[in-house]
Amino acid sequence: MPDVSNIETHRASVPTTDGFAAFLALAELWRLSTDQQIILLGAPARSTYFKWKKDGGSMSPDTVERVSHLMAIYKALQILFPIPERADAWLSRHHRFFGNRSARDVLLDGKLEDIIRVREYVDAQRGG
């Protein structure tokens, strides 16, 4: 299983070797396609995505914030569902709170507000 435990992000640009590597591990666990990953990252150019993946670089503050929220969602789900398969499956289940849509679908709408909405929901479910 990919290691996603070492992500530390802040509002300034950060080297992708830290945040982006953690995001890629998360994307693998959640079985996200390249197009889905690009959506979650805030739709950077495909060339930028592949540059980050190959050579590293710096992510914008918006991208750092997105990755931070996604990692928090992942960690909250691990607390709520100690069995990893159940935590990952939760993303695909439909939830009344999201208008009978899955959290994955809400996340893939691509707006930062939607990522925050999913994060706030899972944080509330775990009592955080």
Say what each PLM segment does:
Residues M1-G128:
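Non-transmembrane "mature" sequence context
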